[in-house]
Every structure is written in structure tokens, then in C-alpha cells.
Amino acid sequence: MAREFSLAKTRNIGIMAHVDAGKTTTTERILYYTGKIHKIGETHEGASQMDWMEQEQERGITITSAATTAQWDGHRVNIIDTPGHVDFTIEVQRSLRVLDGAVTVLDSQSGVEPQTETVWRQATEYGVPRIVFANKMDKIGADFLYSVQTLHDRLQANAHPIQLPIGSEDDFRGIIDLIKMKAEIYTNDLGTDILEEDIPDEYLEQAQEYREKLIEAVAETDEDLMMKYLEGEEITNEELVAGIRKATINVEFFPVLCGSAFKNKGVQLMLDAVIAYLPSPLDIPAIKGVNPDTDAEEERPASDEEPFAALAFKIMTDPFVGRLTFFRVYSGVLNSGSYVMNTSKGKRERIGRILQMHANSRQEIETVYAGDIAAAVGLKDTTTGDSLTDEKAKIILESIEVPEPVIQLMVEPKSKADQDKMGIALQKLAEEDPTFRVETNVETGETVIAGMGELHLDVLVDRMRREFKVEANVGAPQVSYRETFRASTQARGFFKRQSGGKGQFGDVWIEFTPNEEGKGFEFENAIVGGVVPREFIPAVEKGLIESMANGVLAGYPMVDVKAKLYDGSYHDVDSSETAFKIAASLALKEAAKTAQPAILEPMMLVTITAPEDNLGDVMGHVTARRGRVDGMEAHGTSQIVRAYVPLAEMFGYATVLRSATQGRGTFMMVFDHYEDVPKSVQEEIIKKNKGE
């Protein structure tokens, strides 16, 4: 079957926001107006189309980014719903990686909130064009112009309204289109009867002022428009729309719209804006990658004629069809039943069936084309971030960066029967979510799970119970500490054993130096003249990696260390890989005596919003928790405090803040960086770990 929609008429968009800004409801309405749903599901009734996992419906938050496809105005719009809660940032990152544009949803009462900043920053890193939808205009305290101001103040975004609201809160009844200079009046809350009228007299002056500001802002991004504007010539609506589109796609300008998804107002106009201002796959630069055979950089322009190249961005286990791999096609065409090359793993995979998803129903299709987003059944080895390409034209596309987990819990099955089931369940969950790690403590045999935050692990333990019917006891959350060296040193590792039969002999000299933060472990072989034979070099590296998994101070993984093997000796008969592995680990232990080993702890960026009267309490909380305040700003009668606080001190803070502010204070935290723990704390940690 031929393509239904041309590339120019395809939009791949994400909907991103702070938790509770009304993102899922907005997506719902889009699906409703584009004819994919017959009855609207409300998030607060727990029956939304996109939130299809049971826990999402209970908690009223979106956890997994469901990809769905819809049609509007002769275009295909593929939508990826992204979670707004910080514990699920990997979900946001991996969806941003495969999008061409996004709609940022704000709560008009609060404007830009902490998580909006996080997602906005990630979208800027990936160069994603955005339009902004100020939602919840019907809410008490909704203030459209205040929301626009927060985009400037908190995100330094060049954002300008292309619409103005008529009325707000209960009186929100229409929208002024600053391009057509017309008013859309809603006569009911179903969004079915819309009247296009002239702008009401009392709003005319404000509309003219903001249209002028809009034209000026767009003209600043385009020389031709600037010349016309300065010479006082009239800029036509077509030129204005083209100017906004170009500036938005270049990520130089962000159009701001308003509405209330819950009351069905403004959603159709927002869909029009998605088509008008967000890019098609043809409008963005061709994706780049590396040819695994030649190491040369290559690109894949969006075209059906090019060789097939796609990126797997999500794995899901579906109760009916098993393992689903969501992928974005960048170039070429793929038919079900064909073979592709997973260039990231170097494995050939067969595509069983191809499904196009709509929230949680699915339609089987034969072929996907460049620019499409679909899910494949039957891929065995593919994980998040892998490239899938034509076997004859291999390319590895840029992958998705995965943040390290910062919090861990011990889990143990309640019965022997649960033991095996738990292993399978954890493995499946880890396949779906790369920020979730499962480790078995070799000494104690305990299973430890690690993730991005308490909610993240709660949800996973909950899924284990529901989807895999595994009952487990969960320990208290623990911080994922790390260890490192703070000084350079040289150390010898010498291992010799003679006890009848074949002996063991390994001798190495290694120079250890601190590495840059986040660079991990780097090994360099500087052996000259074969004093350590080449076949034993990998054993030295392996020995170091294995001993660094349990650090020298308190057994935490070591990070950010460079090791240079520069001298050593060997024995013709007795040297072996095992002997050199042991020698390397002895060198590490020896180095620890002089390399100033340190324990690192995760520092969280904490944003606390509390009534002004409680500001003193909040500052006290931060200092008492070894934190440092980074900045403050007033927001109505509240104060917003940003601070860096060690994760170890944040457990149970929700209860403390709640009682100090009579339930009016809230806080959000997101991992920021690792930092040395103070000496006194370090000694406590070592004592606790040795005493166990």
C-alpha cells in the first residue's frame, strides 16, 4: 500500500509539562477531536485513553509515554505523551530524542514550574522546536500574561502570545486570534459550538498592542520582514505565519496559545498551530550517525528512497502480543516479515508484525515509511537507544544518554514460589526502563533494585505485584554512594604463589589519577617492550574493573579514575590471566593508601514552594540537612526556594514540610551531581558498612 500521508504532511510531536498541568487531558482532547475516541476519559476519574497502565489511572499521572497516531486537517500527527514527574525523566528524554516538535503545556495559574524547567532544558539540548499551550484558563487564579512572563523570567525564552484569552476563571469564554484578528467565542463547554466574531471592543486595544509586539518579535528573526517592518509596510497574515513557522523551527521563537482542555476550549486552535508552526521530518536536519564498518560519519535524510534507518526508543511488555519495540523511522521503508540489522548490538533481527498504536488499542500494518513512529513485535535483542538499519547500509545513530540511578532498595520475595517469578519480572522491567537496575549482592545474596527516585521504585514494585503477580518485601530506601580517588599515586601489585604443580605469577605497576566528573573509569596500556605480554593486558583491566565494583573504603562502586599500566614483569610458565587479575586488584588496594580515597553522595536540586510565613522554617530545613540555598523568588504569596541537598538527608522530608506548612508546602527534587561527603559523615558510612 502506498503512503497515506506525505512527509510534508507528517508531524511527530510530544506533549510535555510539569506534573498536573493537564497534559494527559490535553492529549485526550486531541484524540477526541481527531476522531480517535468516541467518549472523553477524564484523568481525575481515572479513565484516560493515554494513561493505560493501572497505576497511572490510580495515581492520575502518566508514567510511560504511549505513542499514538491521529489525523487533523489532512495531516498525520503522531503524538508521544511524556510523563511530567521528575522520577521518569528518562521517559521524557527518550521521547524527545525521536520527536520533531513539542507542545509545552503550562498551568495558567502557576506558569513555568520546576519540572517544566527540567523538560524545557532537555528539549533545548535536543534542539526541539516548541509551541506553548497555557492550559487551565478556567481555573481560579488563571493568569495568561503572568504565565507568558514566567517563560521569559524562568526560561529566558523568546516566547510571545499569538492568542489572547477573553475572560478567565469561570468567565473564560473565548480566544482572540492575533493573526486573523478575530475572536472565537465558545457557547458551551463541549467545544462543539464555536462562533467566529469580531474582537469585542473592550479587548480591541489590548489585541492591537499584542499583535504589534508579535510582529516586532517575529521581524527580529527575519531580515526581509525587518526591512518591511521598519519601512512601515504592512506585513500580511501569510508572511506573519511563514515568519513564525521559520523562527519556531529554528528554535528562535516560541508561540504561546491559551485554552482549557478540560472545558474543550482552544484545543482545535492548538492543533491548527501544530500543523502551521511545528516541523515535518523534512524541515529538520538529516539525522547523523557512524558507519560501523568505516567509522565515517554519515547522514540519513528523511526520504523513502534512502536506505532504512530507525531508532528504538522504548520497549514495552504488552499482555497480548508480548514484547513491543517502539521505533522512529528516519529514512527508508520497512515491511513486516523482513530482516534488519541492529547495528548497536551487531545482531540481525526479524521484524514479525508492525503495529501502529493508538493509546492502548492497536492496528496491524504491513509497511512503515520515513517519518513514521510504530511498534514492532518479535525483536529479541533490541533495547532502548539501539539503531535498526538496512543490512546493506549500516549506520549507528546517536543513542540516548541514560542517567545513573541514585536510590536503591532491597527486595526479597515473600515465598520460594515468588523467587523465580521475581527474577523474570525484574529482568522484564529492566529491559523496559534503562534507568532501573537490578543487582544481586554477591556476599549476602540479596537482590537490590536501583532507580531515579522513591516514586520510580514504588511504581516498579507495584507493577511487579500486578503484572507479574510477585509478592515481595521491600527494605528502606538506601542512597547509591560512589567512591573515587582524589590524588594521583603509583602502586605495585605483586602476586606469586608456589604450592606444588603449576604456580601463579603476576606483577604490575599502575599509575592512578583522578578523572573528570562523569567520565567514569579509563584504562591506558603504556607497556613498552613486552614486560607484560599483550595477552595479559585485558586481564589487568578486567581485574581493576571487578575490584572497583566494590570500592576500597566502604564497598561502593568506584568512578572517575584513570589507570595507566606502565610496568611489570611476568614468568614464562607461571603467569596466567588469573594471576594478573589478582595483581591488578592488589595494586588498587595498595594505591588506596596514598590516593586519598573519598566517598561521593548524590546531591539533589530541590525546589521548595511554601507560604511566605514559613520561609524561615524552610531555610532552617535546608541548613539542617547539610544543604545550601541556590536562589529564591516570590510567587504570589508563596516563596520558591532552590537548594542543593544531599539525597541522604531528604528521606521523609515530605512529612516534615507538610507539618511545618500545614500541608500548603510542596517540594520537587531531581538528581543534579555527585559531591564528596564531609569527613565526619564519611567515617559514619565506613563504620556502618564495616559493622554490618
UniProtKB/Swiss-Prot annotation:
Keyword Nucleus recorded: no
Superkingdom classification of source: Bacteria
An annotated GO BP: ribosome disassembly
Compartments in which it is found: Cytoplasm
Residue sites binding GTP per the record: 17-24, 81-85, 135-138
Similarity comment: family membership: Belongs to the TRAFAC class translation factor GTPase superfamily. Classic translation factor GTPase family. EF-G/EF-2 subfamily.
PANTHER family: RIBOSOME-RELEASING FACTOR 2, MITOCHONDRIAL, TRANSLATION ELONGATION FACTOR G-RELATED
Protein name per Swiss-Prot or TrEMBL: Elongation factor G
Species of the source: Streptococcus equi subsp. zooepidemicus (strain MGCS10565)
Gene: fusA
